[in-house]
Amino acid sequence: MKTPFRDRVELFANKDVLKDHYEPEEIRERDEEIDQYANALQDVVDGWEPDNVFVYGKTGVGKTAVTRYMMDALEYEADDRDGVDSVTSVEVNCHHHPSSYQAAIALVNELRGDTDSDPLTTGLSTSDVLNALFDEIEAREGTVLIVLDEIDNLDDDDMLLYQLPRAKTNGNIEDSQVAVVGISNDYTFRNDLSPKVQDTLCEREIKFPPYDANELVTILDDRAERALSSGVLTGGVIPQCAALAARDRGSARQAIDLLRESVNVAIEDERETVTEDDVETAVRRVERGRIKDSIKDLTTHGQYVLLAVTQTAIADDTPVRAKELYEVYADIAAEYASDPLSQRSVHDHLNDLSMLGFLRQHDRNYGRGGGQFFEYELDVDATMVQEAIADADDATV
Ligand SMILES: Nc1ncnc2c1ncn2[C@@H]1O[C@H](COP(=O)(O)OP(=O)(O)OP(=O)(O)O)[C@@H](O)[C@H]1O
């Protein structure tokens, strides 16, 4: 039988090494941040109650990878030293558990994961869930580090962030100690916390800057060596992936995605080496994937507003004022049999789309009589947006 599958091309030695969830054997180019982290958590291995830590930096700059490495190192070190209490770390991603209540349930269930206890279900009162969490922490009779990744998604209240650091002072736990490690892409989250929570959660702050091209080359060299068969990459591929990612967001994730996608391009072409042309093709694919993912996260009307700017850009009528855009938007909403939102809401959507990197906002000030207003233009490729919205069509629009 003839099937659509290609013969296997042996470019990957271990494809998993280029997947996002892969935990690197070694952390590269983050010595300074690791030192700061070690200083912040030194008290744990010295037998004192640890400080809480707030880690921030843009997406893909190694916050999660370094935190996991630090937690492993801490657990290892505490095991290795005489007279030091055991260390348990537990990680929850607040993107998937966006309220204090949900995050607390997830933490209890993570902690119960390696015991015989049944998982908690929803329907319990907040104080029952919190008490279950204190019980789990107390049962460890040691130091428990609670890692809250993407902590800025905790959108309801500060309950968990207020209660956890005070658990010992308030007598909720006695034989254990607890510290919170909060990780965020968004520094403004810190400033929006109530002063009491800010003081405790941000006792130690560690900033992760974007990577430069040289640092990304080191990270990619390391990954490529483990992921790919030898001789697969031609000379310029890694520097090119590194330079493109450094110029854009300085994200290791973006650089690794580019490398993986470049290899895929060569494999689909049934070639045995990857070239710089493959990187060019990969850039468009990765960008399209990124746009598609972010578009999926927009509300339906957010997508209509983006489509309105896109159509205006294709007609070569951008930068455009919100007022002029409104009619295009209203027509699109009508096409989808949806009542248009108010002008004010469309303004808010334009603002959000600018913050998310879809649009560029220009502040026009024509002085007395001319007025002050914003104009918008597309900051991503129009064709890519159209393709992505067409793909998302079935699911959302
Ligand atoms: N210094 C590094 N050495 C090796 N690999 C790294 C390094 N920094 C990041 N990576 C890899 O890059 C990818 C993204 O890193 P990570 O998830 O830690 O970023 P992040 O800052 O937590 O991003 P986000 O805020 O989006 O979660 C992962 O695959 C990670 O293994």
UniProtKB/Swiss-Prot annotation:
Belongs to the CDC6/cdc18 family. Involved in regulation of DNA replication. It comes from the Archaea. ATP binds at V61, G62, K63, T64, A65, Y211, R223. It comes from Halobacterium salinarum (strain ATCC 700922 / JCM 11081 / NRC-1) (Halobacterium halobium). InterPro entries: AAA+_ATPase (IPR003593), AAA_16 (IPR041664), Cdc6_C (IPR015163), Cdc6_lid (IPR055237), ORC1/CDC6 (IPR050311), Orc1/Cdc6_arc (IPR014277), P-loop_NTPase (IPR027417), WH-like_DNA-bd_sf (IPR036388). Disruption phenotype: Not essential for normal growth. This is ORC1-type DNA replication protein 8. SMART domains: AAA (SM00382), Cdc6_C (SM01074). GO terms for molecular function: ATP binding; ATP hydrolysis activity. GO terms for biological process: DNA replication. The keyword Endoplasmic reticulum does not apply. The keyword Nucleus does not apply. Keywords: ATP-binding, DNA replication, Nucleotide-binding.
